[in-house]
Amino acid sequence: MKYVVTVRGMLKAADEKQSQATHDATIDKIGPMGRSMGNVGHQAYLNPQNRREFLAVDTWDNMEGPQKLLADPALGAEFAMLFDGQPQVTFWAAADWKSW
């Protein structure tokens, strides 16, 4: 089964390039650990009306991997550098409904 985890929050830095650099460094550090736990994709989005509003959509092949990764203090420390406050994290499971 396929799972999606969304992470939505306000970026800490007002400078978008600084936020991107922090995000990309986080992915470089945490990405290999996530992939080893079943993370098969990561996409980052910014709200076009407020580019400090961030949304990540991560695709997983299991539910245990993201739960374990999100509980890791290393990821918490990275989130503290990236976000102004705690981001909202939501878990979704693929439905066996028609999709395209």
Regions found by a protein language model. Give the residues of each.
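Active-site phosphate/pyrophosphate- and oxyanion-stabilizing loops and adjacent acidic/basic residues
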Residues: 77
